[in-house]
């Protein structure tokens, strides 16, 4: 039950932050904020899952709440998919493909960067 409460609580924070950022940005191509959020989420998820349990005395429920709840609600694959399909359907194929390439490529690089920083900040025997 503690795990569900942690996930729910952190999901409210992550979803609220995501919506807040979406409201602040008024780019004509609003989907780039989704791309940026997903890239930041990939980086943060790597840090949370690798670094947090080793550096701080937090329970597994908190780590799962932060990763599944906060990062899961902050990032969004469904919005990414919907926005990509909208771009294709409105005839913006190059833009849609650029969005997919940027999201996947930069997301993977952000995850790798999070893993790299985790190994840098942790003693070798802990990683």
UniProtKB/Swiss-Prot annotation:
Q: Which stretches are transmembrane?
A: 4-24, 31-51, 62-82, 94-114
Task: Summarize what activates or inhibits it.
Answer: Na(+) is not transported, but it plays an essential structural role and its presence is essential for fluoride channel function.
A cellular-component GO term for this protein: plasma membrane
Q: For this chain's UniProt record, which GO biological process terms are given?
A: cellular detoxification of fluoride
Q: What is the membrane topology noted in the UniProt record heading this document?
A: Multi-pass membrane protein
The protein's GO terms of the molecular function aspect are:
fluoride channel activity; metal ion binding
Official protein name in the record: Fluoride-specific ion channel FluC 2
This chain's source organism reads Lactiplantibacillus plantarum (strain ATCC BAA-793 / NCIMB 8826 / WCFS1) (Lactobacillus plantarum)
Q: Which gene encodes it?
A: fluC2
